[in-house]
Structure formats: structure tokens, C-alpha cells
């Protein structure tokens, strides 16, 4: 965050990697961040990595560059903190419109650099809103952000964190009933011990799962009433507006990022808090520990933050969110029926290739069930993250790649002759990591626009990326 007005802003590529943490700092030798993404467009990259991060598109970079130019002009007569506040207010309005939330009492939107910071903020708000000690109940870290648990406990040592595994030791998913029972047991135990519970509902996890079920979350909300807060971890942003509205209508806060499915640059996050829940939080003293992670303008002006948070600014966050909104705008222009049709066609093609070729095995993902929220399913019922295990050919058949070998394939993909990228490996069972082929909103726009003329190209490219991963597996 800036601390003094500048006469000239850094160039767009530099601003895009400022105002985050070490994860988006560029490797001086390779020119990419920890997620393998540089700060400028790479039109030749076959990018199917959106569960982790995406390289910025030409369109999104142009949007960020236009904003940078406007910021620089405005700094001649406005202070940076005033500009920052104005731009975030604009982005709140556009995000509300793009998420089609106009039929609800207006929720509050809090901006932050990362999804990790959103979880930190939610935990702090929960702790501040109750006189009881708090328990955060979440899915195991193999299926969510690796630093979330540490971030919560470091910021709030008095908060306990409990986690539920979504997969068995062999990598197969636990049944929904088993997962729900585990969440319920831990929540009821905490409640009986006098704790307030923050339940983090994963939608979608690293391998594409929803947990606990929304039915379980609703039952816990009824049982624990005011002693339960719910945060929907939708940081992948693989949810339709109807799903988001349904969550907010039930009083659930929702964490989103612009850098996963939407395809914007890494480190652009937003916490959407329903009006009723926000009103309850605002009645309590604002958590002073958030001064290290928030600026005053990150919060709507109805929050009592001015005595706690600095009037600082983060122009890198502005550019990253503006880039993400340009991608979301294009995606929201599509008809849901066309999106659903393409997603289903794509999913069938990926499942056929992954299950019908000895170079891969499918990492099972249960169906996406949001029936407790909505009677009519939307496009977000269709799988868009495809985790798979790689094998290399041997004289006797095939041999599974271990975690180190899988990581090497992941690292080699962007630098190979065929320039491509997959989602980071996920440890889904003992000694085994899955790569993830992922659809992004940008790819869906390319496939569906122009009457779907490019749909086959997007599918063929994805199959080509899988073929390249198989070739590299045989070289490890």
C-alpha cells in the first residue's frame, strides 16, 4: 500500500505485482510469480490453469493500463487515498451489478488482496461479534488455501481451527454423509463447550468438491442459530449469480476472487457480507488486528473503521480487480443455456480422454449438489476442474508418477515447445499429486461467442495440453 503521493506511477506490468505478498513477486530469473504467471499477456499460451492462476489476457491488460493512465492523470489534483476510495466504490457497484444482486438488500463488499486475507477478516469479525471463544470449522488444507489455517491462528491465537478431510487415504472422496456427519459432530461439540462456530463452506475446493453439503450447513444454522456464522469459500468463483444470491439470502457471507475462474491476475479478492449480517457486525467494536491487512477504503463507508485503519491505498489491487471485472463482464454477457451446453460438452470430452488413456487416471469428483439452495440448477452444476493422475509407460505397462515427478511435469509445461499450463499439483492421497485441467470464464467466452464457432478449438486445445503432459511424464 502506498504511503505518499507519486508524480509518476510504475508501469502497468509492475503495478500488477504490487500490493500483494511474496506469492506474486516475480522470480528475477524466470520473470513469473509463484504460480508461474508473468504480469503481461502471453497469447501463445494454452492456459488451462485457472484453479491456481491465469496469465492476464490482452483485453484485461488493456483495461488495467487504461485505469493506470486515469489514476496518473487524477493524481495531479486528487490525493491517492481519495482516488483509491472512489475507484473501490465504483468497483463495488459494478460487482454487485455483474453478480445480479439487485433484488436483495444491498450487501456490503470488503476488498482485500488475497483469499487468505478474506478468511482472516471473517475470523476476526466472528471473534469480535461474540463474547464466546470461537472455533473455525473448515475443510482440510489439501483442499483449500494452504496458508488459511496459519493466517487465522497467527492473527487470532485465541481462535481454534478444526478441519475435516474430504478424501480417504487412497484418494477416493469420502461420502457426503460421512463428511457431513464429521462437520456436524465437531460443530455440536464446540457449541456444547461454549464456543461460537464459524463454518467455512467450501464451494469449490481444489479438486472441485462442495463440502459440507448445503443441507448440512442449513441444519447446523438451524441448530446453532446465532452461535453460528457461515462463510462460503467461493474463492474459485465457479458459482452462478443465483447461487450467490441464495447464499446471501440465507445470511451466509461469501468470499470471491477475481483470479481463479474469472481469469484476472492473482491477488484480487472480495468478501460479500449480507445486509443483515453486516449490520450485526457493525454494532461491535471493529477488530484492531485488521489494521495490518486492510485500508479504510477497502470497507464500505458505513463501517466504523476510520479510527482503526489507515487512509492508505493499493493501486495494484485496483488494476488487478479492473482486469478481472473486464473478464467477468464478458462472461456475464453470455446466455446461461449456451454456457451450460458448452460446459457439458467439454466435460464429456475431458472425462472420455482421462478415463480412456493409460497415461492418466481420473481423480474422482462427486457431483455438484446445491439442491438445498436452489430448485433449478444452473451452469455451476457442471464440473470445470478435472484432476488427474499421470503415469509413464513401462515395458510391463505403466508406472504412476510420484509427487516430485508430477511437480516436474507441471513446471516443464510452460517452457516446453508447446507452450501450456495446468493447475498446480494437489496432494490428494499419500505420495500422490494430481494435476488439474481447468476451464476459465475466458475460455468459455472464446468457446461460446460467435455462435460457438470456437468451441471445438477450445476442446481440442485442452486435449493437446493433456497429450503434452503425457509426453513429459514419459521423460521424467
Question: Language model features by range: what are they?
Answer:
Residues 406-439:
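Conserved PLP cofactor-binding pocket of PLP-dependent enzymes
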Amino acid at each position: 500500500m502506498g504511503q505518499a503521493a507519486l508524480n509518476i506511477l510504475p508501469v502497468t506490468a509492475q503495478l500488477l505485482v504490487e500490493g500483494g505478498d511474496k506469492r506474486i513477486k516475480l522470480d528475477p530469473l524466470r520473470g513469473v510469480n509463484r504460480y508461474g504467471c508473468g504480469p503481461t499477456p502471453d497469447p501463445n499460451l494454452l492456459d488451462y490453469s485457472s484453479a491456481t492462476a491465469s496469465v492476464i489476457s490482452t483485453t484485461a491488460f488493456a483495461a488495467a493500463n487504461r485505469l493506470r493512465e486515469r489514476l496518473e492523470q487524477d493524481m495531479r489534483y486528487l490525493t491517492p487515498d481519495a482516488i483509491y476510495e472512489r475507484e473501490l466504490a465504483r468497483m463495488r457497484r459494478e460487482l454487485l451489478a455483474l453478480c445480479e444482486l439487485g433484488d436483495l438488500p444491498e450487501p456490503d463488499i470488503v476488498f482485500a488482496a488475497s483469499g487468505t486475507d478474506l478468511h482472516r477478516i471473517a475470523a476476526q469479525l466472528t471473534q469480535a461479534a461474540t463474547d464466546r471463544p470461537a472455533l473455525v470449522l473448515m475443510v482440510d488444507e489439501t483442499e483449500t488455501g494452504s496458508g488459511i489455517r496459519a493466517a487465522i491462528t497467527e492473527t487470532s491465537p485465541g481462535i481454534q481451527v478444526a478441519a475435516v478431510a474430504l478424501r480417504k487415504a487412497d484418494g477416493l472422496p469420502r461420502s457426503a454423509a460421512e463428511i457431513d456427519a464429521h462437520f456436524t459432530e465437531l460443530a455440536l461439540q464446540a457449541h456444547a463447550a461454549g464456543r461460537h462456530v464459524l463454518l467455512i463452506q467450501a464451494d469449490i475446493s481444489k479438486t472441485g468438491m462442495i463440502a459440507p453439503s448445503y443441507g448440512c450447513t442449513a441444519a447446523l444454522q438451524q441448530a446453532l442459530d446465532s452461535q453460528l456464522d457461515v462463510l462460503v469459500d467461493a474463492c474459485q468463483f465457479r458459482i452462478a449469480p443465483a447461487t450467490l444470491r441464495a447464499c446471501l439470502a440465507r445470511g451466509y457471507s461469501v468470499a470471491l476472487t477475481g483470479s481463479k475462474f474469472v481469469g484476472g491476475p492473482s491477488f484480487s479478492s472480495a468478501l460479500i457480507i449480507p445486509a443483515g449480517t453486516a449490520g450485526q457486525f457493525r454494532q461491535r467494536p471493529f477488530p484492531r488486528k485488521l489494521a495490518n491487512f486492510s485500508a479504510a477504503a477497502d470497507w464500505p463507508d458505513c463501517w466504523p473503521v476510520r479510527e482503526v485503519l489507515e487512509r492508505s491505498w493499493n493501486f495494484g489491487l485496483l488494476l488487478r480487480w479492473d482486469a478481472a471485472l473486464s473478464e467477468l463482464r464478458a462472461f456475464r454477457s453470455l446466455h446461461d443455456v449456451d454456457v451450460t451446453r458448452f460446459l457439458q460438452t467439454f466435460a464429456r470430452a475431458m472425462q472420455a480422454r482421462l478415463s480412456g488413456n493409460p497415461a492418466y487416471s481420473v481423480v474422482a469428483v462427486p457431483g455438484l449438489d446445491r439442491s438445498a439452495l436452489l430448485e433449478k440448477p444452473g451452469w455451476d452444476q457442471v464440473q470445470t476442474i478435472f484432476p488427474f493422475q499421470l503415469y509413464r509407460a513401462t515395458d510391463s505397462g505403466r508406472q504412476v508418477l510420484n509427487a516430485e515427478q508430477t511437480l516436474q511435469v507441471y513446471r516443464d509445461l510452460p517452457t516446453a515447445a508447446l507452450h501450456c499450463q495446468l493447475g498446480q499439483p494437489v496432494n490428494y492421497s499419500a505420495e500422490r499429486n494430481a494435476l488439474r485441467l481447468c476451464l476459465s470464464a475466458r475460455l468459455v467466452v472464446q468457446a461460446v461467442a460467435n455462435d460457438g464457432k470456437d468451441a471445438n478449438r477450445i476442446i481440442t486445445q485442452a486435449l493437446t495440453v493433456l497429450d503434452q503432459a503425457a509426453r513429459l511424464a514419459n521423460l521424467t
